[in-house]
């Protein structure tokens, strides 16, 4: 059995790591490179960096900090933010990123997934999906440009349909960002993640809602995800990564220490 992964997420805005609640009211939590180095030293399996306003502001993630991170850490990391061409993806990979993630650009141009997969192979192509539960229609819908509250907009896609579409086009991994749960630390959306797991044949990363070690155990055992992503519990020191991994191991979840 493959070991499950613990993935700290670093949202980047204006060169700093920030964190919001339900994609709003972001506050600065630290500097990019020191935080990345800290998490690598604390036994994180992988890191994800999101330049959260890049797509909404029509720019691309800054390569300067990508190269600095690559020099400082020895674990895989993924970068996202405004990447919408083969050339931009190649640059980020050349500067040291192991994977690139696309979200809003893929919604604007789904064929981008095919082109990236053809060029680089699916193993380094991650699709981020910002999924919002609409209580009025009891459905999960995909939103776009979520890094800027003023720019956020609805799309034509229901989450299940978009999950199937991005797999058909060749993504290698999916990060499901559950917007309603983001930053509130009340637990992952097990129902939605299990629903997506049933139609997802590539590795699935859960994002949004982690508040306790028990929440991580629940998402691995009840939703069957391959990795759990979290931000505020790690940034604020609420959960220590190595202790979390030992807890999960003690409860039957395969982990690398």
Swiss-Prot record:
> Which reaction equation describes what this protein catalyses?
5-[(5-phospho-1-deoxy-D-ribulos-1-ylimino)methylamino]-1-(5-phospho-beta-D-ribosyl)imidazole-4-carboxamide + L-glutamine = D-erythro-1-(imidazol-4-yl)glycerol 3-phosphate + 5-amino-1-(5-phospho-beta-D-ribosyl)imidazole-4-carboxamide + L-glutamate + H(+)
Q: Does the keyword Calcium apply?
A: no
Q: Where in the cell is it found?
A: Cytoplasm
Which EC number applies? 4.3.2.10
Q: Name the pathway.
A: Amino-acid biosynthesis; L-histidine biosynthesis; L-histidine from 5-phospho-alpha-D-ribose 1-diphosphate: step 5/9
| Protein origin, superkingdom | Bacteria
**Principal location:** cytoplasm
UniProt-listed CDD domains: HisF
Family under the similarity heading = Belongs to the HisA/HisF family.
This protein is called what? Answer: Imidazole glycerol phosphate synthase subunit HisF
UniProt source species: Shewanella loihica (strain ATCC BAA-1088 / PV-4)
The taxonomic lineage of its organism, from the top, reads: Bacteria, Pseudomonadati, Pseudomonadota, Gammaproteobacteria, Alteromonadales
Gene that this polypeptide is encoded by: hisF
């Amino acid at each position: 059995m493959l070991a499950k992964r613990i993935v700290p997420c670093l949202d980047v805005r204006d060169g700093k790591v920030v964190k919001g609640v339900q994609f709003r009211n972001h506050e600065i939590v630290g500097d990019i490179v020191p935080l990345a180095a800290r998490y690598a030293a604390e036994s994180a399996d992988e890191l994800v960096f999101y330049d959260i306003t890049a797509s909404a502001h029509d720019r691309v993630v800054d390569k300067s900090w990508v190269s600095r991170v690559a020099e400082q850490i020895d674990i895989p990391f993924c970068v996202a933010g405004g990447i919408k061409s083969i050339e931009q993806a190649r640059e980020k990979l050349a500067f040291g990123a192991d994977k690139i993630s696309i979200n809003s650009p893929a919604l604007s141009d789904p064929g981008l997934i095919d082109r990236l997969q053809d060029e680089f192979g699916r193993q380094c192509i991650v699709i981020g999906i910002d999924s919002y539960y609409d209580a009025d229609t009891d459905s999960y819908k995909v939103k776009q440009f979520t890094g800027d509250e003023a720019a956020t907009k609805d799309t034509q896609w229901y989450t299940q349909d978009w999950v199937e579409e991005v797999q058909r086009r060749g993504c290698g991994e999916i990060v499901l960002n559950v917007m309603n749960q983001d930053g509130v630390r009340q637990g992952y959306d097990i129902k939605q993640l299990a629903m997506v797991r049933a139609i997802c044949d590539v590795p699935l990363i859960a994002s949004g809602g982690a508040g306790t070690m028990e929440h991580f155990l629940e998402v691995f055992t009840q939703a069957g995800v391959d990795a759990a992503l979290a931000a505020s519990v790690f940034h604020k020191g609420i959960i220590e990564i190595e202790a979390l991994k030992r807890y999960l191991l003690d409860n039957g979840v395969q982990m690398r220490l």
